[in-house]
Amino acid sequence: MTRGLVGPGALWDNREVEELSLPTSVRRIGNYAFLNCRSLRTLRMYDGVRFWGASAFMNCRLLDHLHLQRLDEEQRETLYYFVGEMSREVQATIVDTDGSAARLVFPEYQEIYEENVPHHQFEFHIQGAGYVYRQVFRNKKLALPDYDALWKKFLGMEYEPDCALRMAWRRLRWNAGLSEEHAEAYRTYLRQHTAEAMEMLLAERDGAGLAFLLTQTEPDKEMLAAAAAEARDMGAAELLAILLEEQHKRFPVGRMKTFDL
């Protein structure tokens, strides 16, 4: 558990909890269980919960990441409940019993009521691609092929480019259950936005991620040079080394010819 305030004499305050890990023994989450955990960003738990109460995440306004560890082959309803409670963009990392992982982004959506004055009634509208992504469950169990199949449809909707980048990157990087057909669709998007993807990974100082991205994309000389310059300015030696090695591999400098007279 991570809190904003720690040390001798510090008083417990659920409003200061930033990251919370639940034990494997938890089987029931009651009504309003995390009420007013206003600083909570990440919830780590096991997929063993069999009952979810009402409004468990009320006023958890910063919570945007669920890390879910499977206990066995049976998938339960935790992910369905989590994404159903959040209309904002959220991320879920699902780790299977064999250690393989899928990291999914569920985009934001909004439910809007507009007053139709002449008819004295309200009209209900849904905006944003996130709503359809919350329908990729069958009997409250995640269907990964359905999630991946939405990608091309998503690109035809109104969406945030940064969100699309996170979706494509995380699904390709943590790719449990990902077919090659769908992997290529995500890969194509990253090839079209390689500069932005490199910038994102530089900001995160993710050396392993950057190395993986370079195996999946085809950055040109100018992209690599710009990224290397940024890594140099950041003082990020590991990232710079990865980029310089990639430059040398893709665009080797010809050896100088010498002659003995």
Indicate where each model-derived feature is located.
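Conserved hydrophobic site in ankyrin repeats
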Residues: 212-214, 243
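Structural signature of tandem-repeat unit edges
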Residues: 1-5, 13-28, 38-51, 61-81, ...
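Non-catalytic accessory regions outside enzyme or core folds
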Residues: 177-185, 220, 243
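Charge-dense, extended regions
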Residues: 229-261
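Hydrophobic/aromatic side-chain positions at a characteristic register within alpha-helices
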Residues: 201-205, 232-235
